[in-house]
Amino acid sequence: MRNIAIVEDEDSATALLKGYIEKYAEKSGQQFNVVRFKNGVDFLEDYQSTYSVVFMDIQMPQRNGMSVAFDLREIDKTVSIIFVTNLSQYAQKGYEVDAVGYLMKPVSYYDFELKFRKALDVYAMNEEQKITITVAGGFCRISTLLLFVTVICV
């Protein structure tokens, strides 16, 4: 089961995305656990590196989603980010945080499915290069590219 975060202050936009995720799950036979955050501050405070995809609104109270995405990249370089907004002027900036996609509201299912499938594929490719270990208080994902193995022969 993959964990999906929706960072969105509008209830109607959240309901639409959840419905699309459920529809995609039915069509693909995959299972998703969806967690919603009403603002970016709560999202970052509660963030755990267990999300595969983050749907991020840009225009939100307290902090805009673009600045939240920059902070997210400081703690998780592999999670797939999809911006969902009605502000097209931020599309170019999304490349700076390696966003997988940019969906304009109101979101059509066709556009959603294309971006969501791509986000899952990108995340899966990144995950193939990581291992998960148990640490005090939870789990930690480590890139296998950063691991050095020491073999001691007696």
Tell what function each PLM region has:
Residues N33-V53:
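Acidic, metal-coordinating helix/loop segments flanking the phosphotransfer/catalytic sites
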Residues D11-V35, E74:
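Two-component/phosphorelay signaling modules centered on CheY-like receiver
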Residues M1-N3:
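Non-catalytic signal-transmission and effector/linker regions of two-component phosphorelay proteins
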Residues E45, Y51-N126:
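CheY-like receiver
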Residues E8:
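Conserved acidic carboxylate
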Residues Q30, K77, Q129:
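Residue-level signal for beta-strand positions within conserved beta-sheet cores that form or flank
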Residues R117-V154:
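Conserved binding/recognition cores within well-folded domains
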